[in-house]
Amino acid sequence: ETPHPKNNTVYERYLPAARGRSGKRRAVVVLPQWNAQPNEHLALSRVIAKAGISALRLSLPYHDQRMPPELRRADYIVSANVGRTLQVCRQAVLDTRRAVDWLTAKGYERIGILGTSLGSCLAMLAAAHDRRIEVAALNHISPYFADVVWEGLSTAHVREGLDGSIDLERLRALWLPISPQPYVERMRGKRVLLVYGRYDLTFPLRLSRQLVHEFRQRQVAHEVRVLPCGHYSTGIAPFSWLDGYTLVSFLRKHL
């Protein structure tokens, strides 16, 4: 548990699949981006449900109803407090695995995960540590948590709080447990989609390509989609339509 009681209750939005397709019951845990609003990713979740796959949209730690009154943003999950960032990201992964517990208790036999931005990192960590998650759609990718914070446009204020106290090499080592890179081998045997934007300044292109290279070098099966947009423009039409189609098509095919 964290020191904030509000944050210790997990909130989820459950969208059951539309009827019509026979076979094994399928569900996807949806992890939104950092500082996502309560209604974000609900439209995508509805499309997933209409495609015959139930969707469970999870509120990340310190987001939505889980945010204590002293916060206006979910700063505790990504901040210059290195230890707290580790702890809260770990909590997010544990929350996700408990969501999988809930889905299996409801009789779902095939479970996937979809994560965007920070949610993508957390989704890969959850999938790497949970054999029940068979399919992972990772939307915006990087091998290292620290490098995104260090180089990304959206985390410049976090780096400002770190400057002068720690260098990138040390930060990368400390945040390695919450980085995808050490867990690439654990994704072997799963269906994995890696999506990134060609003009992304928040998850810089070099980092996205580096994670793809890790999968290729280790010969861990995966698919790659490169979108003709940046980070936040992924959420704006027509790029949001292209991104949504890419993600849902992959889930529908492999789950």
Q: Where are each of the predicted segments found?
A:
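The feature captures the conserved acid-bearing segment of alpha/beta-hydrolase catalytic domains
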Residues: E151-L207, H213
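Hydrolase active-site cap/lid region
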Residues: M124-R170
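Alpha/beta-hydrolase fold nucleophile elbow
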Residues: T104-S117
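Cap/lid segment of the alpha/beta-hydrolase catalytic domain
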Residues: V30-Q91
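C-terminal catalytic histidine-bearing segment of alpha/beta-hydrolase fold enzymes
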Residues: R209-L255
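N-terminal cap/lid segment of alpha/beta-hydrolase-fold proteins
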Residues: E1-R21
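Glycine-rich nucleophile elbow surrounding the catalytic serine of serine-hydrolase chemistry
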Residues: G115-A127
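Active-site loop->helix "elbow" adjoining a glycine-rich segment at hydrolase catalytic centers
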Residues: V88, A92, S117-S120
